[in-house]
Regions:
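Surface-exposed molecular-recognition determinants
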Residues: 1-299
Length: 299
């Protein structure tokens, strides 16, 4: 088995071998932080969108840490999520509560500047890919305790949006957003409004070093395993925000970008509605732009 596993803040020894982790033995080590050491200034270095047919390898320009892939034609299909941390054959579906599943080579993350998705369907697929970078995006795995606790992260900024999913068991995707606050949770796999539930984030906003989870099994069940995706705003690169609708045919939301948005995810929080995704591959141009929904199988 693996002797060492990378964590969000360093590494974890997974062996009792005297060469790595002997009882009361002394060791020295050197470790170098992965990835960029500064917040990104160019979105193309940390985010990529691509549309392709069937299984395909394509250039990304950076190591992919999070992949969100959806079928855009043909019969209905779930959008699926994979990460470098959990490996090439593991995935979660965004429209359901299923535990993490396996499928041989559904993703290939071990490529320096490319990515491969292994879907073998006759329909086109769209891939949205993130690379970890300070103040922009981080991805961590942790184990639940069943008691209120904090979880360390390496985002280097206060997370403004978090997606948390239990990997080991069936349960909802719990979403934190800075503008709905830590007293409420939104469910990525559901269309319901933001719900006031203190057992998800223990009514405690995240900080630049930790986020808090409550006692609910969706985020912190004893003996369960979880993955958390953390997002924050970087001027000119990414924006996490909110707005109030005006009911008119036109409303402009200023994200501070100089060349427009390539990806937009939005969800109504005060009433029932879907999680909508728009992107530049399909064309963010007019009010009739096509979209996908994260919480349904109707891509």
């Amino acid at each position: 088995g693996n002797a060492l596993e990378v964590t969000s803040t360093g590494f974890q020894l997974k062996s009792t071998s005297s060469g790595f982790n002997g009882s009361s033995a002394s060791y020295v080590y050197m470790a170098i932080r992965r990835g960029p050491l500064a917040a990104p200034t160019d979105a193309t270095k940390v985010f990529h969108v691509n549309q392709q047919n069937n299984a395909d390898t394509f250039s990304v320009g950076f190591p992919t840490d999070l992949a969100l892939v959806a079928k855009t034609g043909g019969s209905s299909s779930n959008a699926v999520v994979g990460s470098r941390l959990t490996g090439d054959d593991k995935f979660l579906v965004t429209s359901g509560t299923d535990a993490e599943a396996s499928s041989s080579s559904i993703f290939t993350f071990d490529l320096q500047n490319s990515f491969k998705q292994g879907f073998s369907t006759s329909a086109e697929n769209v891939s949205w890919l993130w690379g970890r970078a300070p103040s922009y995006f981080d991805c961590i795995c942790y184990s639940g305790t069943g008691s209120n606790r904090t979880v360390s992260h390496n985002l280097g900024a206060v997370p403004e949006m978090m997606w948390i999913k239990c990997r080991s068991n069936t349960d909802n995707w719990a979403v934190f957003h800075k503008d709905t606050g830590a007293t409420k949770v939104i469910f990525l796999n559901n269309d319901i409004a933001a719900s006031t539930l203190s057992t998800r984030f223990n009514d405690t906003a995240p900080t630049s070093s930790v986020f808090t989870v409550g006692t609910d099994a969706e985020v912190n069940g004893s003996g369960r395993t979880y993955i958390a995706y953390l997002f924050a705003s970087v001027d000119g690169v990414s924006k996490v925000g909110s707005y109030t609708g005006n009911g008119a045919s036109t409303q402009t939301i200023d994200c501070g970008f100089s060349s427009g948005a390539r990806f937009v995810l939005l969800k109504r929080t005060d009433a029932t509605d879907e999680w909508y995704v728009f992107d530049s591959v399909w064309g963010i141009v007019s009010g009739n732009d096509p979209f996908l929904t994260m919480n349904t199988t109707n891509a």
